[in-house]
Design a protein with these regions (language model features):
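Extracytoplasmic beta-strand/coil segments of soluble accessory domains associated
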Residues: 181-216, 244-253
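Short, acidic, small-residue-rich periplasmic hinge/interaction motif at the N-terminus
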Residues: 62, 106-108, 128-170, 193-195, ...
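Short acidic/polar hinge/loop motifs at secondary-structure boundaries
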Residues: 213-241, 296
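Short, ordered, surface-exposed loop/turn motifs in non-cytosolic proteins
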Residues: 47-72, 160
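Primarily recognizes Gram-negative and organellar outer-membrane beta-barrels
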Residues: 37, 218-221, 241-283, 298-986
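A short, amphipathic beta-strand motif
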Residues: 36-48, 132
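A short, solvent-exposed loop/turn motif at the edges and junctions
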Residues: 66-68, 87-90, 94-119
Length: 986
């Protein structure tokens, strides 16, 4: 039967490939172009930048005897991928007997230059590009200094230039002393997360650049926290071309969405630096140092900061505080590092990298209540936790790249290394009840864990607590590589890329675990003195060969083959130290001095070693059709982009699981086909941008979940393996819309998205809850019926002619349909339950700016409704509302006052104390001295003392309402000093 299915599958695959091949052939035969298309870009030999338009740049195509074949005046255009300005001329040359020609380039103030060029022709399509560098004939020519367009006539906030969204930084009024994060938080359509992630128009920014180049590539927070906002000229958002696309001269992939921070001219060369120091009440402190040196071909930056004010959680100038950070707590951070970049003006080579070090202390306390939904009746938990952690992190990343401008070949090598060490100790308490306690969680736990606690607590299911201390170490070392070779006299090429990685980690934890439950009308006690040791090392080797076939002018075929090998070796040893008589009365962290004694305490049922060898073969057929309509200046007027990419993946595993009781050997293999389709449309005059995406992705279950074993290492949460797990299939459909030129001149912004995701054979946890003991037994199973849908719409527009009053609305609706299995002990099999959840949110902003006054109103509301097929399910409805106002006002004598007042409202929660209103007020007064080189500030944080971190939410299985500790209100005096030193003009 399996053989028949395999043959049937192969026949269907062959038919599909045959149809695709015929389709390509038909398209190819219909679009033959025998002319050679030559693109010429004229640049300055010294700066490496395109010449200015007023230079009257001209290029002649000559035969070897100097006979003029064609002549043209260069036109200015912006590269759609990198945003770079170019002076371009194009020639369409029919087939010639002699393929050798001369290019003659001339421009006012520059020496004429002759460059030989050899053209080629083929049956499908021939195209090539050439850069010509001209040298100036005068030593100085200030009249022709290159410059960039400035938005000075009006303080327009944003506009589109081709495929680039440009924000004018000077149009935003910020608090004195604001860093880059304060600016980005105010950009229309941009969203800044607490961890430094940036989203623009709903899409994640993959890289944050400084003047077009990487800056601490793996950590956005360095630039966000240390670059002063006053240095920024523009913020540009665009899809950056990949290195392969640049070398081929045409788009072969989507590249990556980047946010490029363009500095003002006076800060783009020389030394700049700033330092800030502050001290306040409640022993709050802050210190920061940042220095940056620019030259035309290099950059060096150094930073360092220390603080205990949780500076990732702060007002954003729009009445908001960013998203809730579940790590929370009180954090003291010390971090520093440096970044370097060296490159030549012709982009032949680039050396860049960074080194980072950080040391963090965190005190995280949280507590509250939660409700677990069960078919036989809900259970209620009162819980509290405190964990103190210290972490040391070191990392370094480097990139070395070389490009041959003559052959358009390139290569890069990127090594990395990171090290981390963590120490922690924690205390956890929990009480589980069959009926919701009347007292608040703190009173319940204090009574439950007091020395005089009584075993006759009403409705108690279990009492459990744990004290723990431990540490962990981790190292990650590896390197990625990339090589591209362009086929001579063609638009084709191939690349070889991949990476090698080794990850090593180990950890050890001591914990004292106490568990009490009622059984046969007697309170049972389970005490465990445990030592957990983990050791893991992973090795990955990956290589890919990809060919880029320029089929016709508009059609590309990019097949690739990827081979990947992963080896994982692990060791988990659990020691039950309470089995040793000498452990009685010992403090947490005790180990016997002899290894023989330690081995006697080994829990053989929950200790194991394992080795996994995984091989993955992937064949990808990437077909693209791109159609652009351009004007005489090479600006895109409309576009079509279609991508069809089927992937054929075969994965094999060899898993050796070694334990004292049940060693196992597994060799699962999977076919994991994938399919991706994308359609992108730029309507005429680029008035609208439309994107449609469809994907089907098959994935295999984790090999460890296929083991036939029962893990009882945690006596309250038992897990059971499932050898019968199947592959899952994820289907995604999404549509994105963005208004482009349609609303650009009116300074309006409109974008939206809608999508649907469904999973076949989704992996879900089927669990059984024992109401007598409070023990949960979980097994991973396949389920059908999981899907979710969403829709988002965002709109920004001015409400007056002079664009002083701006209005922004952001709406979203998310619907979740979730299926899983749950039961209590009274039922034989877990019951299939279906949960439907609707999450709706709306944010409104109104901002007024006139001269030195910036006022704003903000309102946001989130509504969450949930229903379930569980018997007796309460169908909760919760509201989270935020509204307030903020202001930034410039006063006489170089003073500035900024303040925000926000009301946080919560409704619909089970705990009465959660349904509350918190009014939060912050203010800052600053004064600038010495021509703005020195700034004095006084901050007042949470003046009314109402700020609270509340983590409240729900899913298909539970609802929770937790409080975390927050920074107490404080006042701080801060001093900021700025330094800008430019090289002397010769």
């Amino acid at each position: 039967m399996k053989t028949y299915l395999f043959r049937s599958h192969m026949k269907n695959t062959q038919r599909i490939l045959l149809l695709i091949g015929c389709f390509w052939a038909l398209l190819g035969s219909a679009q033959k172009d025998t002319n050679h298309h030559l693109w010429v870009n004229v640049i300055d030999a010294f700066t490496g930048q395109a010449l200015s338009l007023d230079r009257n740049v001209k290029v002649d195509l000559l035969q070897l005897d100097s006979t003029v074949v064609s002549s043209a005046i260069c036109r200015e255009r912006r590269d759609q991928g990198s945003g770079e300005r170019q002076m371009i001329v194009t020639f369409s040359v029919p087939l010639q007997k002699d393929p050798r020609f001369l290019l003659r380039a001339s421009a006012a103030g520059y020496a004429t230059k002759y460059v030989p060029v050899t053209l080629f022709w083929n049956k499908r399509f021939a195209e090539s590009s050439k850069d010509i560098s001209l040298r100036r004939t005068t030593a100085s020519d200030a009249a022709y200094q290159l410059g960039e367009a400035k938005v000075t006539a009006t303080k327009i906030k944003f506009y589109n230039k081709g495929d680039t969204l440009v924000y004018n930084a000077d149009a935003f009024q910020l608090q004195e002393g604001s860093m880059l994060d304060g600016l980005i938080s105010q950009l229309p359509g941009a969203e800044l997360k607490p961890d430094g992630q940036i989203f623009v128009n709903g899409k994640k920014v993959e890289s944050l650049l400084l003047n077009g180049r990487n800056f601490f590539k793996n950590d956005n927070t360095v630039l966000l926290d240390n670059l002063p906002a006053y240095m920024v000229h523009r913020v540009e958002v665009y899809n950056q071309e990949s290195e392969t696309s640049k070398l081929l001269g045409h788009k072969v992939d989507e590249g990556q969405l980047v946010m490029d921070i363009k500095l003002k001219r006076q800060y783009s060369i020389g030394w700049i630096g700033n330092t800030e120091w502050g001290y306040g009440t409640e022993k709050r402190y802050l210190g920061r140092l940042f220095a940056l040196r620019f030259t035309p071909q290099s950059r060096l930056s150094v930073y360092g900061n220390l603080n205990n004010v949780n500076d990732r959680r702060k007002p954003d100038g729009n009445g908001g505080w960013g998203d809730f950070d579940p790590s929370g707590g009180l954090t003291a951070t010390k971090r520093g590092g440096f970044d370097y970049s060296v490159y030549d003006k012709r982009n032949r080579f680039r050396l860049e990298g960074d080194v980072n070090a950080s040391y963090t202390n965190n005190d995280n306390q949280w507590g509250g209540t939660s409700t677990d939904f069960l078919s036989s009746g809900d259970v209620f938990n009162a819980v509290s936790s405190r964990q103190q952690t210290s972490s040391l992190n070191l990392s370094t990343n480097h990139n070395w790249k070389y490009t041959n401008q003559t052959t358009n070949n390139g290569a890069s090598f990127s090594p990395w290394f990171s090290y981390s060490h963590n120490d922690y100790h924690s205390n956890f308490r929990n009480g589980t009840f069959g009926v919701k306690p009347l007292d608040n969680y703190a009173e319940v736990l204090d009574s439950l864990f007091s020395p005089e606690w009584t075993t006759t607590v009403r409705h108690l299911i279990r009492r459990n607590g744990q004290q723990a201390r431990g540490n962990s170490d981790g190292r990650d070392v590896g390197a990625s590589y990339w090589t591209f070779i362009k086929i001579p006299q063609s638009r084709d090429g191939f690349s070889i890329d991949g990476h090698v990685q080794y990850v090593h980690s180990k950890s050890g934890e001591f914990n004292h675990f106490t568990y009490n439950h009622l059984e046969q009308e007697a309170m049972q006690t389970d005490f465990r003195n445990r030592y957990n040791y983990f050791h893991q090392q992973n090795t990955t080797v990956k290589a890919r060969l990809k060919y880029f076939w320029h089929w016709t002018r508009n059609i590309y075929l990019n097949p690739s083959y990827t081979l990947q090998f992963k080896r994982s070796e692990g060791n988990h040893s659990l020691y039950r130290l309470e089995f040793l008589p000498e452990s009685e009365g010992k403090d947490l962290g005790w180990l016997p001095s002899q290894m023989e004694s330690l081995l006697q305490a080994l829990d053989t049922d929950n200790s194991n070693e394992s080795t996994l060898n995984n091989w993955s073969h992937q064949l990808t057929l990437d077909w693209q059709w791109n159609k652009y309509v351009k004007d005489e200046n090479f600006r895109t007027l409309s576009s079509w982009n279609v991508t069809v990419r089927p992937d054929f993946v075969y994965e094999t595993n060899r898993f050796d699981y070694r334990s004292a009781n049940d060693p196992q050997h597994l060799t699962p293999g999977y076919w994991l086909p994938q399919f991706y389709f994308q359609l992108k449309r730029g309507t005429p005059s680029l008035r609208h941008r439309l994107d449609f995406d469809l994907s089907l992705i098959t994935s295999a279950p984790s090999v460890t979940s296929l083991l036939r074993r029962t893990d009882t290492a945690d006596p309250l949460h038992i897990t059971v393996g499932n050898p019968d797990l199947k592959r899952k299939l994820d289907g995604n459909v999404s549509f994105n819309y963005r208004a482009d030129q349609w609303l650009q001149r009116k300074e309006r912004q409109l974008y939206g998205s809608a999508g649907w995701h469904i999973t076949h054979n989704a992996l879900a946890a089927s669990y059984t809850y024992n109401r007598q003991t409070g023990v949960t037994t979980t097994q991973t199973v396949n389920v059908d019926g999981n899907w979710n849908a969403w829709m988002n719409l965002n709109f920004t527009l001015p409400l007056d002619r002079k664009h002083r009053l701006m209005f922004t609305t952001a709406s979203s609706v998310n619907f979740y349909h979730t299926v899983d299995y749950a039961s209590s002990r009274e039922q034989e099999h877990p019951v299939r339950t279906t949960t439907r959840a609707t999450l709706t949110s709306e944010t409104l902003r109104l901002n007024y700016r006139y001269k030195s006054v910036n006022l704003g109103l903000t309102g946001a509301a989130t509504y969450n409704h949930q229903a379930s097929t569980l018997e007796g399910y309460a169908s909760p409805n919760t509201w989270n509302v935020r509204y307030g106002l903020h202001a930034v006002v410039d006063l006489p004598w170089h003073l500035q006052l900024s303040s925000d007042l926000t009301m946080f409202t919560r409704r619909g929660y089970e705990t009465a104390s959660m349904n509350r209103d918190d009014l939060v007020w912050n203010a800052r007064l600053s004064k600038s001295l010495w021509r703005n080189q020195l700034t004095l500030m006084v901050d007042a944080w949470d003046i009314l003392g109402n700020l609270s971190n509340v983590n409240a939410g729900m899913n298909s299985r539970s609802m929770w309402e937790y409080y975390t500790n927050v920074i107490p209100r404080y006042a701080m005096f801060r001093l900021v000093y700025r330094l800008n030193r430019q090289p002397k003009k010769k």
